[in-house]
């Protein structure tokens, strides 16, 4: 009898994606992050759904409703903190996943890569809108500062900002629309993730060597599935350690003060996962220039395939490029640190230098390093 797994129209799709999928035999733990991102997304949708049952998107009651969830709803506190820290885990996995793609040359799968960049933007937008919902001080002022950046767009800027606000400032209309968008976006992300996977399965996975692995493939199930489960256990372990021991470690204490349009917090800063981009934004004294640099800092990922000058795909056998890659990682960590610091003497210049370094490494130093390596290998 033919296995139903291989014949049933629905089971067949699942089978070809997660069970009988031919996987390279040498993929390392850096290939775990795709499945971990899927788990993060499911977790965020589920916890978010239960939070939405008790949350009220209204300026007068939003803050109180979050307090009510934490105090009065059964296990509301754990759902709330799983959702908040789940976002941090989501972004850790995202950065690792993108970093893996850069290191091993996975960006040569153009469709998969471009959908991935769109996914990154969508996730960042969702996280930003979610941060506004508790309606604390940092929620309100974060929303004010970031939406205001659109006013830097020539001619239509001011109208655009007021259209997004639904008024002349961040208010009730802004909160309700952000809640609506924050609810719908994860489902759009889930749909895009399926398209991401569809394009990936057209070519098959890359592997650490960057050499085609068609001659040496193994079935996904039992081998890579167990490995994914191990990754998931570790992910949930780290998440629950955060949630149960230090739930507010990554949050901002200002967000425990209800939003007050008349009182600006001394240091407005986003969640830690946006600090690198925030530092790049702040390092340029011009408003429009800063906004462009902010967008380009992420959009630069789209042109990575064009900047690939090496004859090899992966960085596994390219020590100079490896050095460049890890300098870039160090630079991003520096930017993250600077983004959380006040705009004062040593930090301003460090931020500006780190921002210049960021674009210099990606646009100049990495392609040049690749050319040098090609010449050293006489290729």
From Swiss-Prot:
Signal peptide: none
Cofactor notes: Binds 2 heme b groups non-covalently.
Annotated PROSITE patterns: CYTB_CTER, CYTB_NTER
Ligand binding (heme b b566): 97, 196
Subcellular location: Mitochondrion inner membrane
SUPFAM superfamilies according to UniProt: a domain/subunit of cytochrome bc1 complex (Ubiquinol-cytochrome c reductase), Transmembrane di-heme cytochromes
Keyword set, alphabetical order: Electron transport, Heme, Iron, Membrane, Metal-binding, Mitochondrion, Mitochondrion inner membrane, Respiratory chain, Transmembrane, Transmembrane helix, Transport, Ubiquinone
Pfam families, alphabetized: Cytochrom_B_C, Cytochrome_B
Binding site for a ubiquinone: 201
Keyword Nucleus: no
Transmembrane segments: 33-53, 77-98, 113-133, 178-198, 226-246, 288-308, 320-340, 347-367
Main location: mitochondrion
A GO molecular function held by the record: ubiquinol-cytochrome-c reductase activity
Membrane topology: Multi-pass membrane protein
Cofactor list: heme b
GO terms under biological process: mitochondrial electron transport, ubiquinol to cytochrome c
Residues the record lists as binding heme b b562: 83, 182
GO cellular component, as recorded: mitochondrial inner membrane; respiratory chain complex III
CDD domains named in the record: cytochrome_b_C, Cytochrome_b_N
Protein family: Belongs to the cytochrome b family.
Function: Component of the ubiquinol-cytochrome c reductase complex (complex III or cytochrome b-c1 complex) that is part of the mitochondrial respiratory chain. The b-c1 complex mediates electron transfer from ubiquinol to cytochrome c. Contributes to the generation of a proton gradient across the mitochondrial membrane that is then used for ATP synthesis.
Note: Heme 1 (or BL or b562) is low-potential and absorbs at about 562 nm, and heme 2 (or BH or b566) is high-potential and absorbs at about 566 nm.
Binding partners and assembly: The cytochrome bc1 complex contains 11 subunits: 3 respiratory subunits (MT-CYB, CYC1 and UQCRFS1), 2 core proteins (UQCRC1 and UQCRC2) and 6 low-molecular weight proteins (UQCRH/QCR6, UQCRB/QCR7, UQCRQ/QCR8, UQCR10/QCR9, UQCR11/QCR10 and a cleavage product of UQCRFS1). This cytochrome bc1 complex then forms a dimer.
Entry protein name: Cytochrome b
Organism: Ovis vignei
């Amino acid at each position: 009898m033919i296995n139903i797994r291989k014949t049933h129209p629905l089971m067949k799709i699942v089978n070809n994606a997660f069970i009988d999928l031919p996987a390279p035999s040498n993929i390392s733990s850096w290939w775990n992050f795709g499945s971990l991102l899927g788990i993060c997304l499911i977790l965020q949708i589920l916890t978010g759904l239960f939070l939405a049952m008790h949350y009220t998107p209204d300026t007068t009651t939003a803050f109180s409703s979050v307090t009510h969830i934490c105090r009065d709803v059964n296990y509301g506190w754990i759902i709330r903190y799983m959702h908040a820290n789940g976002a941090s885990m989501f972004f850790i996995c995202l950065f690792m996943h993108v970093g893996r793609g850069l290191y091993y040359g996975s960006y040569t799968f153009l469709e998969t890569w471009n959908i991935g960049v769109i996914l990154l933007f969508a996730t960042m937008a969702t996280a930003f809108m979610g941060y506004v919902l508790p309606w604390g001080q940092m929620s309100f002022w974060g929303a004010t500062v970031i939406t205001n950046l659109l006013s830097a767009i020539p001619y239509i800027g001011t109208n655009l900002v007021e259209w997004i606000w639904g008024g002349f400032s961040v208010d009730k209309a802004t909160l309700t629309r952000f809640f609506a968008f924050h609810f719908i976006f994860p489902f759009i992300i889930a749909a895009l993730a399926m398209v991401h996977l569809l394009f990936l399965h057209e070519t098959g996975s890359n592997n650490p060597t960057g050499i085609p692995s068609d001659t040496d493939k193994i079935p996904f199930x039992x081998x890579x599935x167990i490995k994914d489960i191990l990754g998931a256990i570790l992910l949930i372990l780290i998440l629950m350690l955060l949630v149960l021991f230090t739930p507010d470690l990554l949050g901002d204490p200002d967000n425990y003060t209800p939003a007050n349009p008349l009182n600006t917090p001394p240091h407005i800063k986003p969640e830690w996962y946006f600090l690198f981009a925030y530092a790049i934004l702040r390092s340029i004294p011009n408003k429009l220039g800063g906004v462009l640099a902010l967008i380009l800092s992420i959009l630069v990922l789209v042109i990575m395939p064009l900047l690939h000058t090496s004859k090899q795909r992966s960085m596994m056998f390219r020590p100079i490029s490896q050095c460049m890659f890890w300098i870039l990682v160090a630079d991003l960590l520096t930017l993250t640190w600077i983004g959380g610091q006040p705009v004062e003497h040593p930090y301003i210049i460090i931020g500006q230098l780190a921002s210049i370094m960021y674009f210099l490494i990606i646009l100049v130093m990495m392609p040049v390093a690749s050319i040098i390596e090609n010449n050293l290998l006489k290729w």
